[in-house]
Amino acid sequence: MKVRASVRKICEKCRVIKRRGRVMVICANPKHKQRQG
C-alpha cells in the first residue's frame, strides 16, 4: 500500500474508489494499491 498525496491509475486494471472518505486505488496488481493521505 502506497500512501501518496496524489493517487492515480497506473494501469488499465486500476480502479479509483472512495472508502470512508479516503480516495484509494485498487488493482489486480498488489503493487498498484494506493491510498491518499
From Swiss-Prot:
Gene Ontology BP terms: translation
Alphabetically ordered keywords of this record: Ribonucleoprotein, Ribosomal protein
Superkingdom of the organism of origin: Bacteria
Assigned GO CC terms: cytoplasm; ribonucleoprotein complex; ribosome
Gene Ontology MF annotations: structural constituent of ribosome
SUPFAM superfamilies assigned to the protein according to its UniProt record, in alphabetical order: Ribosomal protein L36
NCBIfam families cross-referenced by the UniProt entry: rpmJ_bact
Protein name (Swiss-Prot/TrEMBL): Large ribosomal subunit protein bL36
Organism of derivation: Synechococcus elongatus (strain ATCC 33912 / PCC 7942 / FACHB-805)
